[in-house]
């Protein structure tokens, strides 16, 4: 359906159809964020020997996050007197908008994708980098030393780990010969790239956790050091925008990892009677669970350890993986 709309001439009817689909995707992502946070709290509770949310919405706390969202919307929206007001207001929007934009190129099934462009992988990497500007702007505009430190940490971390993240997928591009995400999924019909590119997968996984600012790489928001990091001065729905961006990126990064390394909607052998959407959802859920598991398990790294690990360990291994992949392809394919 989307492909037919893209091929048709521009019209108001097509505009409203695309707008409706975008709103539908937005609500689907917001639903994931709402219950993804709840799932994370329940899983963390289980791993730490606690119950987790169990009061609002029954014994499983099904409405706990809904209540939290309502609380955030009703909280006072305060702007510090010394803050740069225009930038302070604009920063959460700059941080959130790219998080939603990157979802346009991710193919969730063979039929469901908003924009099947030839350089979908490059588009995702390029657009996701804009969020760094929003985070740094928020830290600067707050006129608070903790916010500024958090923003500078976030910028340094995201730039440092985006390089090995990009390097880790070059092996896949070499094997596939394309930056199109649909073609990457199609090339994994027989063998998933988690088996063909195990080194690339490990590098991508570690760099993805760092890009998401999640434990053990959550230095920009380190509560014990920086109060709340770059969004210390934010409250209410503006603070919610930053949190929303973080969890929408979790949705996007888990989806991208599913597409790049786990075969997307391709089924496991002899189980092709199960719909592709179900396979995508199962693989996606496994990746999200892995991110949550990391958060519960690992302690926070020091800043110097973080930078040293990115530049001195991940980057050389990623470069070696590119060389090895090119050599194997030249010799055996």
Swiss-Prot record:
Keyword check for Transmembrane helix: yes
Principal location listed in the UniProt entry: membrane
Pfam family, one: NADHdh
The protein's Enzyme Commission number: 7.1.1.-
Keyword Translocase: yes
Keywords assigned by UniProt, alphabetized: Cell membrane, Membrane, NAD, Quinone, Translocase, Transmembrane, Transmembrane helix, Ubiquinone
Signal sequence extent: none
Molecular-function GO terms, alphabetical: NADH dehydrogenase activity; oxidoreductase activity, acting on NAD(P)H, quinone or similar compound as acceptor; quinone binding
Quaternary context: NDH-1 is composed of 14 different subunits. Subunits NuoA, H, J, K, L, M, N constitute the membrane sector of the complex.
HAMAP family listed in its UniProt record: NDH1_NuoH
Primary role: NDH-1 shuttles electrons from NADH, via FMN and iron-sulfur (Fe-S) centers, to quinones in the respiratory chain. The immediate electron acceptor for the enzyme in this species is believed to be ubiquinone. Couples the redox reaction to proton translocation (for every two electrons transferred, four hydrogen ions are translocated across the cytoplasmic membrane), and thus conserves the redox energy in a proton gradient. This subunit may bind ubiquinone.
Protein name stated in the entry: NADH-quinone oxidoreductase subunit H
């Amino acid at each position: 359906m989307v492909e037919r709309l893209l091929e048709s001439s521009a019209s108001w009817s097509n505009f409203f159809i695309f707008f409706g689909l975008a709103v539908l995707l937005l609500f689907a992502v917001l639903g994931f964020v709402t219950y993804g946070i709840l799932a994370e709290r329940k899983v963390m509770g289980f791993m730490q020997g606690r119950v987790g949310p169990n009061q609002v919405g029954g014994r499983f706390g099904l409405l706990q996050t809904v209540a939290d969202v309502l609380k955030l919307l009703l909280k006072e929206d305060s702007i510090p007197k010394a803050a740069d007001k225009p930038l302070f207001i604009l920063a959460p929007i700059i941080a959130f908008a790219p998080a939603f934009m990157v979802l346009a190129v991710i193919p969730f099934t063979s039929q469901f994708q908003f924009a099947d462009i030839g350089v979908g992988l490059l588009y995702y990497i390029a657009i996701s980098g804009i969020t760094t500007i929003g985070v740094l702007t928020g830290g600067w505009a707050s006129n608070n030393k903790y916010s500024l430190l958090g923003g500078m940490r976030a910028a340094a971390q995201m730039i440092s780990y985006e390089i090995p993240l990009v390097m880790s997928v070059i092996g896949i591009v070499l094997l596939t010969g394309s930056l199109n995400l649909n073609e990457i999924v199609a090339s994994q019909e027989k063998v998933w790239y988690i088996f063909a590119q195990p080194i690339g997968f490990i590098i991508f996984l570690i760099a993805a956790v760092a890009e998401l600012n999640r434990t053990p790489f959550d230095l920009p928001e380190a509560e014990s050091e920086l109060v709340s990091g770059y969004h210390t001065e934010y409250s209410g729905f503006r603070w919610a925008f930053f949190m929303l961006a973080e969890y929408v990126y979790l949705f996007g990064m888990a989806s991208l990892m599913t597409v790049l390394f786990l075969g997307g909607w391709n089924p496991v052998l002899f189980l092709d009677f199960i719909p592709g959407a179900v396979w995508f959802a199962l693989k996606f859920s496994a990746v999200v669970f892995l991110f949550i598991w990391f958060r519960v398990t690992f302690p926070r790294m020091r800043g110097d350890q973080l930078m040293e690990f990115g530049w001195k360990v991940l980057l050389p291994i990623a470069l070696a993986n590119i060389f090895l992949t090119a050599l194997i392809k030249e010799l055996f394919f």
